[in-house]
């Protein structure tokens, strides 16, 4: 893991079960002794215009380099590539560091963890058998099962899109077997406080140290049998038959914000204390069964649209996925495994990209660190496009809408970038983006990756693809066409005539 030294354990990525609803994401580790759940809310980001140096420090970063284009193009046509390269390296970057420790305060931004949950079970591995972890792609539910001392234990995990709540149930086939201690470890680069919400709940309210972004995490437990106590920021359950934990979270980030280059709080517009309170009250009122039914019906409407059937599966259909992978690497054909991977990709997109929040980032929605590889940002040079290549073609058109909403927030800053660097109309983006409308190149002079002026037009192709599949003329008229046209304006102005009359970029 790149970046900060906090929490470098990579097991969450290679060994956990990922669940999500496009806003909340979690990774289920499944330990018998203490369940560990990494937790994310997709709009919790460091950086942006509200750091200590304010909006101008964040927005006023474009170099006025357009006047050099003619000189660079002339050098190219005369074969002086060294001069063209030098001018490009020196003038088509910015002073914005991509590394969190490269400037103070860090302004580019990074997706950051909302912390982790731990549930101590009072159990140990002695006498444990029949251990299983299951990720059901059909129901978007993670399950942990095992037996110990002739008791069958089960944990169920899902995150509901309609309710915006994560639901965690601990149960067993014998009564009085749940003895649990639930605790929360927040983002270490934030300042906050935990308070009790009655006897059953906890509320953690905090803000990130870097930019003051406010976030709230709410937890509530409901038990059958036994006792429940709430003290010192922990929920303690004794001798219960069943325990259901409801968890929700939000930040003060406003989806589809309209960038104001003078207002450092331009992206703020939500009260997470109120939103999380409403979600929690609604979830608890519904209860586990009703929430799961609602969750399943919502998810299945998307997932069940497509069935992939390749050649009849070879022997080994009932083997664990880990064993199937080992066999596959040895050259054994397994069409069912290929079908499974196809559907797993659809599952991950549904889990990380739903209307009403940001698009899937470099890690979808899952992250266990305060910083991460490539800031866990939006890489506009192919990665974000790759996330959405299978969206429409696998009948998940709705999952593209967060990407289109994200593109809309790039237009105003992207117009400034297009004008400053290329003297062009329209808008464009650069190599990396974030949730705060960043469209400028970074400080590196390595133009093999930092020079990416066609990022905007590439993003715009996804807008056309969405229309091409949906034939939603209302969308095209009200939203899509202007975004595409403005991107095309940039592309037209970016082209230039070589001396032989041919257009080139």
Where do the model's predicted regions map?
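Aromatic-lined, polymer-binding surfaces characteristic
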Residues: 452, 494-505
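Aromatic-residue-lined binding/catalytic grooves and analogous aromatic/hydrophobic interfacial grooves
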Residues: 1-447, 465-467, 474-477, 481, ...
